[in-house]
């Protein structure tokens, strides 16, 4: 079994808060090698950033909800990383992101563990959660320490 931390941008205002996919693992085109070792049964913490670029939909910009700058969920992977071609998300500056790689998960817990506490648990005072590719492998020890504190965290 592997343990992961994945980073999500806050939902756009036009996306449902309770969408089934909200706690899946998503990797953009070009970052899929990071997810080769993802398998069913793996555990993953979902971290939501404080902010992210707005999305361009046609000629209008769609804002994002305020981000929580916290781990917001713990999930279990139910299917390995798979490819599914999707339309690109066009960002406000014109850059495109294709979130073509995804691993389906089942949400186990939703609590809130702020970045400040995550830094203390990882013993990394400068940790920003700006994880290249949006996926970071955790050791069993790191996972256990985060889980212990996360389970005591604020409920949504």
Residue ranges and their predicted role:
Residues 1-40, 45-58, 120-125, 137-138, ...:
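Compositionally biased, charged N-terminal/linker segments
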Residues 7-13, 44, 57, 62, ...:
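Extended aliphatic helical segments
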Residues 51-73:
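Short, Lys/Arg- and Gly-enriched loop/turn segments at beta-strand edges
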Residues 65-141:
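Aromatic- and Lys/Arg-enriched surface recognition patch
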